[in-house]
């Protein structure tokens, strides 16, 4: 209502007896600005802005705060308030949110400027959760901050590679939570535990040893016995590789003359053949190593949680291929037929497969696993490097062929008698050696034009190789740092789950997304949510005129049910990899209820005095779910 001072000023201005009053205009504008202002207290930090600023992004949590009539607010699934009112004490209302105050400054600045930037001092998952709570899509992040925002996703994907059983290539490190997850999965797949009850209790005693044997040969950090087995396996691997190398040395080879007598009818023919045999001691050592590898392979394939995954693993295929030739050679050594000798000759050639056992060291050394992950992650860079080299080889091989023909003598019709570059395919070898800066010296240009092409080829090779290499080095550094951090991470058996908020406790409502989904729930942990989430009524006539804010989630009806069993490691990794849009497609609603509101049985909210107190319940500690 316009004050009396303003009315008299307006009449005086109309009659011409009194000039217009600027004080009146300033006073009315100040009153309008005061009613338009809103105060948002986030984690103890007060932010002041206009309601019109919050309305710039409709459908978000702050936009619902700025709408006192509830026109743009969706109704709650749980029968919550359909309309609301905000109490005013002559000034702007203040609403409290127990969220991160630093991130909210960037969120509020997004409402003001329309540009969402990512803070550099906040972890990526925390910023993602805050965006989910305030109802802002992650795709609104500015391009300049998108790489910073995506860094935590890349780190989580790299950690998932180390946690996966087939991607890690071996057991988990000390203090590694992924090892506990894998052992838990193994127990679930292999059947009941020993001493279990129920129909499967009889088979549980038989199969209870399988998880222990699997951990004994697969996870070197599961027990002291597993470490002994790991050292024994490492010892036999090194001995087998050493034996393989010594077999090719002349000092361990024995020449033997073999006499063969062939009789065809009445004709007898004698043939002398020379054979080279390996020192028997090396054969015995190799036999002992193969017996250990056979025992290890059989135990692992019998006790593995998933036989199909075991068969598809590359390291297990290498184990089988390296063991098989030894037994075939022993079985065919007593035969003297020509076919048997041919097979033995082939098996001796196939002995080089034993050198592939060196890859089994990846189960015991983190650096080798990191190298394997780096090679797989840098596939695009390697492909780009090959394409660059192929283009350079084709171009410079053609150029060197024609450049060398410039110095040909007139008596040379082909023009290639004075040079080694007889054709373009020969120039491919020279171009590869030159671009990789090896320079064997077997082929080199002899004319001034060929030398110029050779110099250009060497410079192009240096620049071509230097471009993709830093990306590969960065990938290795990222994987190695993550692996080292994962090993130094303290062991976490069970994560702490806080008690659920009680109806009369001063705990504020939170969205479903802030619940510890990734926690490992113990059997004694209480349900995460037994009743609706409650926000305490904030009554402060000096600050906000007795304003009350009650947070509600549109999907709160489903949250009133007790939580199910603890999520599996695969589910936790899937939740970690999911984005903001997948985690929460509908942002939680925030309804404003004044102290005089009554929640009725039909779901409506009516003012004090308009309904009978018996028909409705006062809204003081009620969450609109």
UniProtKB/Swiss-Prot annotation:
Transmembrane regions listed in the UniProt entry: 228-248, 279-299, 314-334, 346-365, 382-402, 453-473
| Primary location | membrane
Does Glycosyltransferase show up as a keyword for this record?
A: no
Q: Do you know which Pfam families this protein is assigned to?
A: BTB_2 (PF02214), Ion_trans (PF00520), Shal-type (PF11601)
Q: Which InterPro entries match?
A: BTB/POZ_dom, Ion_trans_dom, K_chnl_volt-dep_Kv, K_chnl_volt-dep_Kv3, K_chnl_volt-dep_Kv3.4, Shal-type_N, SKP1/BTB/POZ_sf, T1-type_BTB
Q: Motif Selectivity filter: which residue numbers?
A: 437-442
Q: Which residues lie on this side of the membrane: Cytoplasmic?
A: 1-227, 300-313, 366-381, 474-625
Residues engaged in binding K(+) = 437-440
Q: Report how it sits in the membrane.
A: Multi-pass membrane protein
* Region (Inactivation gate) residue spans: 1-28
Gene Ontology CC, one term: calyx of Held
Gly residues bias: where? 77-86
Residues that bind Zn(2+)? 117, 123, 144-145
Its post-translational modification remark reads:
Phosphorylation of serine residues in the inactivation gate inhibits rapid channel closure.
State the similarity comment.
Belongs to the potassium channel family. C (Shaw) (TC 1.A.1.2) subfamily. Kv3.4/KCNC4 sub-subfamily.
This protein's domain notes: The cytoplasmic N-terminus mediates N-type inactivation. Composed of the tetramerization T1 domain, six membrane spanning regions including voltage-sensing (S1-S4) and pore domains (S5- S6) and a variable C-terminal domain.
Name this polypeptide is given: Voltage-gated potassium channel KCNC4
């Amino acid at each position: 209502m316009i004050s009396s001072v303003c009315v008299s000023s307006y009449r005086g201005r109309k009659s011409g007896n009194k000039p217009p009053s600027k004080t009146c205009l300033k006073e009315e504008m100040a009153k309008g600005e005061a009613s338009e202002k809103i105060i948002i207290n986030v984690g103890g930090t007060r932010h002041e802005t206009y309601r019109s600023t919050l309305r710039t992004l409709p459908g978000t949590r702050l936009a619902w705060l700025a709408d006192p009539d509830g026109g743009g607010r969706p109704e709650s699934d749980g029968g919550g308030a359909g309309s609301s009112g905000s109490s005013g004490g002559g000034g702007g209302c203040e609403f409290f949110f127990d969220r991160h105050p630093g991130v909210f400054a960037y969120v509020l600045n997004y409402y003001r400027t329309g540009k969402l930037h990512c803070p550099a001092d906040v972890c990526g998952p925390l910023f993602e959760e805050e965006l989910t709570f305030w109802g802002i899509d992650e795709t609104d992040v500015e391009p300049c901050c998108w790489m910073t925002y995506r860094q935590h996703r890349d780190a989580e994907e790299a950690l998932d590679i180390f946690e996966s059983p087939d991607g890690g290539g071996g057991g988990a490190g000390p203090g590694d939570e992924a090892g506990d997850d894998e052992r838990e999965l193994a127990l679930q797949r292999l059947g009941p535990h020993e001493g279990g009850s129920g129909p499967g209790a009889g088979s549980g005693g038989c199969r209870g040893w399988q998880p222990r044997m699997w951990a004994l040969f697969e996870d070197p950090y599961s027990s002291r016995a597993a470490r002994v087995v790991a050292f024994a396996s490492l010892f036999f691997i090194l001995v087998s590789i050493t034996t393989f190398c010594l077999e090719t040395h002349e000092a361990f080879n024995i020449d033997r003359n073999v006499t063969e007598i062939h009789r065809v009818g009445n004709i007898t023919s004698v043939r002398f053949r020379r054979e080279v045999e390996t020192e028997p001691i090396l054969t015995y050592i190799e036999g002992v190593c193969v017996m250990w590898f056979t025992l290890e392979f059989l135990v692992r394939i019998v006790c593995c949680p998933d036989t199909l995954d075991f068969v598809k693993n590359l390291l297990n295929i290498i184990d089988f291929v390296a063991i098989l030739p030894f037994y075939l050679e022993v079985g065919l050594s007593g035969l003297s037929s020509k076919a048997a000798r041919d097979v033995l000759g082939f098996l001796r050639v196939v002995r080089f497969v034993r050198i592939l056992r060196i890859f089994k060291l990846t189960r015991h050394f983190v650096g080798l696993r990191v190298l394997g992950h780096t090679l797989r992650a840098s596939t695009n860079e390697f492909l780009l490097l090959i394409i660059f080299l192929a283009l350079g080889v084709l171009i410079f091989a053609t150029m060197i062929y024609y450049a060398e023909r410039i110095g040909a003598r007139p008596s040379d019709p082909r023009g290639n008698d004075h040079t080694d570059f007889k054709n373009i395919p020969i120039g491919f070898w020279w171009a590869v050696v030159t671009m990789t800066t090896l320079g064997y010296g077997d082929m080199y240009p002899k004319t001034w034009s060929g030398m110029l092409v050779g110099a250009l080829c060497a410079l192009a090779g240096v620049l071509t190789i230097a471009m993709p290499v830093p990306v590969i080095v960065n990938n290795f550094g990222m994987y190695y740092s993550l692996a080292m951090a994962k090993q130094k991470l303290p062991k976490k058996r069970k994560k702490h789950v806080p008690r659920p908020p009680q109806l009369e406790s001063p705990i504020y409502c939170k969205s479903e997304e802030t619940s510890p989904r990734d926690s490992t729930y113990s059997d004694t942990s209480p349900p995460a949510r037994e009743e609706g989430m409650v926000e305490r009524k904030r009554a402060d006539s000096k600050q906000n005129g007795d304003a009350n804010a009650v947070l509600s989630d549109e999907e709160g009806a489903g949250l009133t049910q007790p939580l199910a069993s603890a999520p599996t490691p695969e589910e936790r990794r899937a939740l970690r990899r999911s984005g903001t849009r997948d985690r929460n497609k509908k942002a939680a609603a925030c309804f404003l209820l004044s102290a005089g509101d009554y929640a009725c049985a039909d779901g409506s909210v009516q003012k004090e005095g308009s309904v009978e107190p018996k028909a409705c319940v006062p809204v003081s500690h009620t969450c609109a779910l």
